[in-house]
Amino acid sequence: MLPPKIFFEKFKEIIWPIERKELKLFIPMALMMLCILFNFGALRSIKDSLVVPSMGAEIISFLKLWLVLPSCVIFTVLYVKLSNKLNFEYIFYSIVGTFLLFFLLFAYIIYPNQDIYHPNDAMINNLIASYPNLKWFIKIGSKWSYALMYIFSELWSAVVINLMFWQFANHIFDTAKAKRFYPVLGMIGNIGLIIAGSVLVFFSSGQYIIDSELLTDSFNSSSCNSIILQPIISIIVTAGIIAMFLFRIINRFILTNAINVLDVKKAAARTKTKLALIESIKLIIHSKYIGRIALLIICYGLLINIVEGPWKAKIKELHPNTIDYVNFMGMFNIWMGISCVTFMIIGSNILRRLGWLISALLTPIMLSITGFIFFIFIIFIEEIGTCFGDFNLLYVAIIVGAIQNILSKSSKYSLFDSTKEMAYIPLSLELRTKGKAAVEVIGTKFGKSLGAFIQSLIFIIIPTATFDSIIIYLLVIFIVMMNLWIWNIIKLNKEYIKLCK
């Protein structure tokens, strides 16, 4: 048995591998990530709660493919051009500030006056009757402000988290520090999901104040407006401002004096790299290593998109109005946060003790097991129902899907993100900066958009199709892409080892 002092040191190494001299940098970085992930959790629930009850879960495929993906491409072009002209710090302020400004505009101006800005239902119904194959595009046009909010909420994840925050972190930490810092950063950051879920549940549980009606109808009242959406958006904007403030503190007061934490090589990496847009694109295309990182993200995005659509359709069946949908997603965020923090504690030790390959493989393994169980349950729900009688199988299906979503995303946030970010570190500054910009923004959304393309194509050709009617085809795609993901990880690991030597 180990002496108490040695046992305590071992326990501290597992739970908190951060040295005391590193706390000056680590604490503001962790708080910054907490604020950013709080916004991510809240925005993820808000965007789904707007579009699914009012337009149907099938609309998500069209939003991701026809709106989110083009927006990501446009943003990437603008970002690469800005990175050649502006300091990264000012780019960060400009981008985050733009997001926060739009959220305020949506909550306080567009949403309360949506009856003025949106076309009337009679006109929309007539258009759908005349052009049934285009009904999903017509529905998007009927709620264009919801679609715009969906785009900005999706871009928050791709841009602010995957691109801005992690690129900043990769410029600061080398591979050795990343193994210790990234899992703990993620663990603390995911507490933001728990806080976001609690905020959503708090505001959506006010049944004694308003009836549980569709939010679009209840928002004819300005008092309902302030009770539900505006306070949540105000908290989101406040968290964003705090994140920008912490970012400024790190740049102005910590990095300049942090030679004990950052070596000279990493300090120099904060300098700006000039690279033309065409050269950047060629650099990405000709790099097999960057291509494999992109394929990791594409596989994950496609598989999650394929599973989430049927799951959200089931949630709508159980919670057809927006307030109840928000409440459910709030509870989902709470359990997601708890699961993520738990996985972060486990994941940090897996990464440090078992290495990159095992850590990277655990996410697809987790997703394949839980996803397969969910698909089988949905496909054979009637057969399963004969064994349980009058039991609420719809509720069980939603819980099975929620468990799948929570476990797969928990392993993704704790292991996939950390291993993916570590894969960038051995690269040159040019590949790390410009390559990451394209891979993170376009790659992230291309995976989801590929799944969305498959689904939306079916819904366009067969207007009466639903997720229940195409579930077996989604299962086949799920199995094929899962095998491709695992094969790509094994190949990428060999190249990663060579670069680290």
UniProtKB/Swiss-Prot annotation:
| Keywords assigned | ATP-binding, Cell membrane, Membrane, Nucleotide-binding, Transmembrane, Transmembrane helix, Transport
The GO terms this record gives for MF are: ATP binding; ATP:ADP antiporter activity
Among InterPro entries, the record links this protein to: ADP_ATP_car_bac_type (IPR004667)
Name the domain of life. Answer: Bacteria
Q: Which GO terms describe its cellular component?
A: plasma membrane
Transmembrane ranges, per UniProt, are: 23-43, 59-79, 90-110, 146-166, 183-203, 227-247, 293-313, 326-346, 361-381, 383-403, 446-466, 470-490
Tell me which stretches of the chain form a coiled coil. Answer: none
Q: What does this protein do?
A: Provides the rickettsial cell with host ATP in exchange for rickettsial ADP. This is an obligate exchange system. This energy acquiring activity is an important component of rickettsial parasitism.
Recorded hits in PANTHER family, A to Z, give: ADP,ATP CARRIER PROTEIN 1 (PTHR31187:SF1), PTHR31187
Name recorded for this polypeptide: ADP,ATP carrier protein 3
Give the organism, scientific name: Rickettsia typhi (strain ATCC VR-144 / Wilmington)
What gene is it encoded by?
A: tlcC
